[in-house]
A protein has these predicted regions:
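Metallocofactor- and cofactor-centric catalytic cores in central/energy metabolism, strongly enriched
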Residues: 1-133, 147, 157-160, 168, ...
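Hydrophobic alpha-helical scaffolding
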Residues: 6, 67, 139, 143, ...
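Conserved structured core elements
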Residues: 14, 122, 143-147, 171-172, ...
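Alpha-helical structural signal in soluble globular domains
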Residues: 51, 108, 152-160, 215-219, ...
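A generic structural motif
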Residues: 58-64, 165-172, 225-229, 255-258
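Phosphate/pyrophosphate-binding betaalpha-module
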Residues: 139, 143-212
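A conserved active-site cap/scaffold subdomain adjacent to cofactor or substrate pockets
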Residues: 188-261
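Internal helical hairpin/lid segments
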Residues: 236-327
């Protein structure tokens, strides 16, 4: 299939791997963060880390929308279903994220909450049309990729006068999170997390373009290469980052030119700006409170804001102490560093959010990488 098969071509990937081995300087270590969970999944699925030279290391970032959702936000959705009698609609992965009191949306549903999995906000709108006597809340999460559909859903609800529909808006923003990582003590002070550059997200960049990454690439001297999700995309992006580091450059480059432009999708951006605005701050799992890193519904559209309609008050809840999800989201640790990975915490029984979604670092490592952690002993045959 055009635009897919050629980006999964093993011969091309091997040629790029050869170039990386030739161009990665022997006396230097390279450390690049793939921000997006889709890239984390691709790196694990296609064994990309094994194709890289030993001195080129990939670090998982917080780009999985389900993973960065804090417990307190899940608690609000559960509260709406169990205490307020609302129909809560959300995406499938969100249903299994652990919340307080050993609950999740799935377990709250088992307790009698009317919680439904949907594929889009349009599905939630249809439920609101069919059940006008019930309050219907769309629990909207995700990065800039899923934000325009949420804004469109709110606009359609207003046009149709659906007074029983509202949105619990938990959309988050990529550039603010990357800046927060670069300002973190692990990167700036202690050197615990050496970062030489970023593999920029694909779908997010289709919406926002490459321009929003330019300020911190210049300010922090960290190159960014936007890449598609196929293995050749990722390999080429890593090669481009190595070349930038070797040449002392720190600019934004676009490997994913078949889908991403500098300005992004202006129509989608205008729709989001019409309905949503930036929050002063928002808690991310693993990162804590991140300034200007999320969106809320504008005052003009407050009739469709579930937080305002139900008088919800957010309460921060600490993560399970045994779970290393926060450190993994910051790039400080890897899934194998967590003591409960693969024992207490599995995809069937996730303790942390990183094990829930296929884009989570722990779930990806469970599916494609956990057997690499097992030491292999070669025994001489008699």
């Amino acid at each position: 299939m055009k635009y897919i098969d050629e980006f999964r071509d093993g011969a091309i990937a091997r040629k790029i791997a050869d170039r990386l081995r030739a161009e990665a300087l022997p006396g230097r270590d390279y450390s690049f963060m793939e921000f997006c969970g889709g890239h984390t999944h691709a790196i694990s699925r296609y064994g990309i880390a094994e194709l890289l030279p030993p001195n080129v290391r990939m670090v998982h970032g917080p780009g999985c929308p389900v993973c960065v959702l804090p417990i307190g936000r899940i608690d609000l959705a559960i509260q709406l279903a169990l205490e307020r009698g609302a129909i809560v609609c959300t995406y499938g992965d969100t249903m299994r994220v652990p919340a307080s009191d050993n609950l999740s949306l799935v377990r709250a549903k088992a307790r009698g909450g009317d919680i439904r999995m949907v594929y889009s906000g349009a599905d939630a709108l249809e439920i609101a049309r069919r059940e006008p006597q019930r309050e219907v809340v769309f629990f909207a999460i995700g990065f800039e990729t899923t934000t325009p559909p949420t804004a469109l859903t709110i606009r359609r609800a207003k046009e149709e006068g659906l007074a029983n529909f509202s949105v619990l808006c938990c959309h988050v923003l990529t550039p603010a999170a990357i800046t927060h990582i670069l300002e973190s003590p692990e990167v700036r002070d202690s050197g615990t997390l050496p970062l030489d550059g970023f593999v920029g997200p694909a779908h997010v960049s289709i919406v926002i373009g490459s321009a929003p990454y330019e300020p911190f690439a210049a300010a922090y001297r960290k190159p960014v290469v936007i890449a598609g999700f196929e293995p050749v995309d990722v390999m080429q992006a890593v090669l481009m980052l190595v070349r930038q580091v070797n040449e002392g450059r720190s600019v934004v480059e676009n490997e994913f030119t078949r889908a991403v432009g500098r300005q992004g999708n202006r129509h989608a951006q205008a729709l989001v700006a019409e309905v949503l605005e930036t929050r002063p701050g928002f808690e991310w799992r693993g990162l804590g409170e991140v300034p200007a890193s999320a969106l809320r519904i504008r005052q003009e559209w407050a009739a469709f804001d579930a937080e305002a309609r139900f008088g919800l008050e957010y309460r921060a809840v600490p993560d399970n102490k045994a779970c290393e999800c926060g450190a993994i989201l910051r790039g400080v640790k890897k899934p194998a560093d967590c003591k409960i990975f693969g024992t207490v915490c599995t995809p069937e029984n996730p303790v942390g959010s990183c094990m829930v979604s296929s884009e989570g670092a722990c779930a990806a490592h469970w599916s494609y990488g956990r057997f690499r952690d097992i030491p292999v002993r070669a025994e001489a045959l008699a």
